[in-house]
A protein has these predicted regions:
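Catalytic domains of carbohydrate-active enzymes, especially glycoside hydrolases
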Residues: 29-93, 308-317
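Aromatic-rich peripheral "rim/lid" segments of glycoside hydrolase catalytic domains that contact
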Residues: 285-299, 303, 307-308, 317-358
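Acidic-and-aromatic substrate-binding clefts and catalytic sites of carbohydrate-active enzymes
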Residues: 72-77, 98-108, 194-200, 224-225, ...
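Substrate-binding cleft/loops of secretory-pathway carbohydrate-active enzymes
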Residues: 111-113, 190-217, 277-286, 325-335
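Extended acidic/polar, glycine-enriched regions
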Residues: 1-40
Length: 358
């Protein structure tokens, strides 16, 4: 909802406006229905709330978002206090994706805030930036150029991985200091492209990286080529889902390999994102939408999560909790808040998998 105010009476201005629905807690920050929707999830990754993909040029504690700010538009996205408080309210472990250019003061203060504010018994996951290996994001070339400037490797593109490892060690050392009284609450994450075991080895072999990392995370997505280079122009859903199933199975096998690489280094293996990755050309937008809403999508997510449990194990974080279907994909496991579970094939499969594991 947008409310435009064109003029006010200076002697009797607008005051105490409250746009929340009647019946909600007057001093509440979160809609309890949204909190309840998140309670099933053990880990909440605050990627989009952190603006890490926006790669702000400067991220300082002085310029950060604070809860009192009407518009949450600081260089670090939504206020960290809101992230911690939502995780506490949902009974989940928060996962913080911190912008690449966060300075030392910011990282130290972040660690202290999370350490002090997070509910007892909860773990905090931290990763520096998001998909620095992915040259589709501006951060990919930023990290590559920093690595090249430091001459970290004779191989051009290895400079990206090694610079990410180098700065992640700096980042995780600061956080380790903040949690030194209870290190078991801290999970220090490196993220990497799914199926890149050699990249894992490169980073773990680089200087003392392995001493400052607890977990390796990848994004086991499937279906990126569907309707673009595979089954172009096809509209028959069973045919499309047969191809998607092949891609799903291949992605799980890559995750199995990545877990083996992480285990070799004594590290946990996690999924930082995952699920279907169908981004159709405009001509196939309608059939892609039908796929997202099809019962066959529920079935493929069932198999995806079942295979993850039996072949991989550990934490799988899907992207994302809520998101509309548009030309950029269909990332949400539901399309809007409050959507009936019966209309959300992906979310229904997720909730069924969670219930089966309780």
């Amino acid at each position: 909802m947008l409310l435009y105010v064109n003029s006010v009476n200076a002697s009797d201005p607008l005051a105490n406006l409250d746009c929340r629905e009647p019946g909600l807690v007057a001093n509440g920050v979160f809609d309890q229905r949204s909190v309840d929707d998140l309670k099933s999830y053990r880990v909440l990754r605050f990627l989009d709330w952190s603006d890490a993909n926006g790669n702000p040029a400067s991220v300082t504690w002085a310029a950060r978002s604070v809860p009192q700010r009407l518009v949450q538009d600081g260089t670090d996205g939504i206020a960290l206090e809101h992230m911690v408080d939502l995780a506490n309210a949902a009974g989940s472990d928060p996962w913080f994706t911190v912008p690449w250019n966060a300075d030392e003061g910011y990282v130290r203060a972040l660690g202290k805030l999370v350490h002090d504010r997070l509910a007892p018994g909860r773990k905090a996951y931290f990763e520096l930036s998001n998909e620095t290996w992915n040259y589709a994001f501006p951060i990919g070339n930023v990290v590559l150029n920093e690595g090249l400037a430091r001459n970290l490797s004779p191989d051009r593109y290895s400079n990206n991985l090694l610079r990410y490892a180098e700065k992640s060690v700096w980042f995780h050392k600061l956080l380790t200091s903040a949690f030194e009284d209870n290190p078991a609450r801290l999970v220090r994450v490196l993220n990497l492209q799914n199926g890149n075991g050699s990249g894992i080895d490169q980073m773990m072999n680089f200087r003392d990286t392995k001493q400052w990392v607890d977990a390796i995370a990848t994004a086991p997505y499937f279906g990126h080529s569907l309707l673009r280079t595979v089954n172009v122009g096809v509209t028959d859903l069973p045919t499309l889902f047969a191809s998607l199933e092949t891609m799903r199975a291949q992605t799980i096998e890559l995750a199995v390999s990545d877990k083996a690489s992480a285990t070799k280094w004594g590290k946990r293996y996690l999924s930082y994102e995952g699920g279907q990755h169908i981004v159709p050309p405009a001509a196939s937008a309608d059939v892609a939408m039908r796929m997202q809403r099809s019962p066959l999508m529920h079935d493929i997510y069932q198999r995806y999560l079942s295979d993850w449990k039996t072949k991989v194990g550990g934490t799988v974080t899907l992207y994302s909790a809520t998101g509309a279907i548009n030309q950029y994909g269909a990332w949400g496991i539901r399309e809007y808040a409050g959507q009936p579970v019966s209309e959300t094939p992906k979310r229904r499969a997720v909730l069924e998998a969670i219930a089966a594991n309780q």
